[in-house]
Regions:
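Class I S-adenosyl-L-methionine-dependent methyltransferase catalytic core
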Residues: 1-177
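Nucleotidyltransferase catalytic core that binds NTPs
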Residues: 178-230
Length: 230
């Protein structure tokens, strides 16, 4: 394994000797960081199931503001510390269960990596816990790596998911929906109203039009008719 880009590009990293620990390959790591490359510099990063620390160290190399490595395995913690030798940056290595870490603090993170052992059943639990604990910053992304054979099926409607399949490995980029409320009487609905909504949809994942009724003004259209036009 090596660091793909940034200050420490090309630096070799030690791989785990434990077959149960499955480090992200350089090819997959490069693809992932091509997708999130504009989100890393200055980001606060939480690397859950950190293993060798390769993902978090890649973030340090690319200018992340802070990286917190979390793994409950003593051997993984030792490996992360070994790979961090010679790496300068603002980082912490935490030997603990991911749920305890998510529930105990209040710091928010721009990027949260979730890369548990395949078929452990911990991945979706960690994604949901990261969302429910409010540890994901506004506009932040959860990067969830898992087996292609076990696809991530979202059970909530407040997130958007971008999926990248790479053979036996799939990576989902999960973030909260960006929503907006556009309130007005819309009586009548104008081309200007439609243009504003169209522009908002370029920025937000979901736009809600709130139709108001002015009791002091005679309506041209009923609220139901305005809703149908919109």
């Amino acid at each position: 394994m090596r660091i793909v880009a940034g200050k420490y590009r090309g630096k070799r990293l030690y791989s785990p000797s434990d077959d149960a620990v499955r480090p992200t390959t350089d090819r997959i790591k490069e693809t992932v960081f091509n997708i999130i490359q504009w989100d890393v510099a200055g980001a606060r990063v939480l690397d859950l199931f950190a293993g060798s620390g390769a993902l978090g160290i890649e973030c340090i190399s690319r200018g992340a503001e802070e990286v917190v490595f979390v793994d409950r395995s003593p051997s993984s913690i030792a490996l992360i510390k070994e790979n961090l030798k010679g790496i300068e940056g603002n980082y912490r290595v935490v030997g603990a269960d991911f749920l305890g870490v998510l529930r105990a603090g209040s710091d928010k993170f721009d990027l949260i990596f979730v890369d548990p052992p395949f078929r452990s059943g911990l991945g979706e639990t960690a994604v949901c816990a990261a969302l429910d604990s409010q540890r994901l910053a506004e506009g932040g992304t959860i990067v969830y790596e898992h087996s292609t054979e076990l696809p991530f099926v979202p059970t909530r409607d407040d997130i958007t998911v971008r999926t990248k399949r790479m053979g036996t490995v799939t990576v989902d980029f999960v973030r909260r929906k960006k929503t907006a409320l556009f309130a007005g009487t819309f009586d009548p609905v104008t081309k200007g109203h439609i243009a504003v909504i169209d522009e908002a949809l370029k920025v937000f994942d979901e736009v809600t039009a709130g139709i108001l009724v002015n009791p002091d003004k005679e309506c041209f259209f009923t609220p139901e008719e305005r809703l149908e036009i919109l």
